[in-house]
């Protein structure tokens, strides 16, 4: 039985799209990102639709002291991902969750965001952490089922497992093409 979600803590009705860790270094691991081309197409579709709908887009990039050092080639956003537009946010993180030790929550609050759409890498790491933390913080969360992935050899199983587990935790899991960019996202 899923845990009851906390009340929304006066979250607004605005929507934001979180684009998590689409970084070159993650696409160039020895085990390739599962369905990389499809994931990039679906993420770009979400970004385009968000921009057309006037929805905040937040690009999140992981920084560490090894292969994702800030400002190195591997740290950069994937060249096939649509680049951030002038009004898009960029958040740099050092932990799995985009909320931990960043100003993401403050930025979302300033924009009266209550609904989060999430896509990114990696399914069982940073995507999982962002979804669960956002639910715990009272956001209404929708994960694009076909716009997150992993470079694990077990990626198909992990994606299916985490789509199920996150849905049980209160995350709405939908194919990217079925996500409705309105304030009724959580009811789609």
Model feature map: region roles:
Residues 20, 56-62, 144:
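Short beta-strand segments at enzyme active-site cores
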Residues 31-37, 67-68:
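Short glycine-enriched, charge-decorated loop/helix-capping segments at active-site entrances
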Residues 24-29:
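Short acidic, Gly/Ser-rich segments with clustered Asp/Glu that frequently serve as metal-coordination loops
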Residues 30, 61-64:
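Glycine-/proline-rich flexible loop or hinge segments
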Residues 2-16, 42-48, 53, 65-188:
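Active-site-adjacent betaalpha module
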């Amino acid at each position: 039985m899923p845990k009851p979600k906390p009340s929304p803590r006066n979250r607004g009705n605005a929507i934001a799209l979180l684009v998590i860790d689409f970084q070159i270094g993650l696409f160039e691991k020895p085990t390739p990102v599962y369905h990389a081309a499809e994931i990039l197409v679906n993420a770009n579709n979400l970004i385009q639709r968000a921009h057309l709908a006037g929805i905040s887009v937040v690009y999140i990039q992981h920084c560490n002291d090894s292969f994702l050092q800030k400002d190195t080639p591997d740290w950069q956003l994937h060249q096939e991902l649509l680049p951030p537009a002038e009004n898009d946010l960029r958040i740099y993180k050092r932990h799995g969750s985009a909320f931990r030790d960043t100003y993401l929550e403050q930025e979302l609050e300033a924009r009266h965001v209550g609904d989060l759409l999430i896509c990114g890498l990696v399914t069982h790491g940073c995507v999982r952490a962002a979804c669960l933390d956002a639910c715990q913080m009272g956001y209404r969360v929708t994960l694009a089922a076909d716009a997150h992935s992993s470079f694990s050899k077990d990626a198909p199983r992990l994606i299916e497992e985490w789509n199920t587990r996150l849905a049980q935790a209160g995350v709405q899991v939908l194919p990217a093409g079925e996500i409705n960019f309105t304030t009724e996202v959580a009811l789609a």
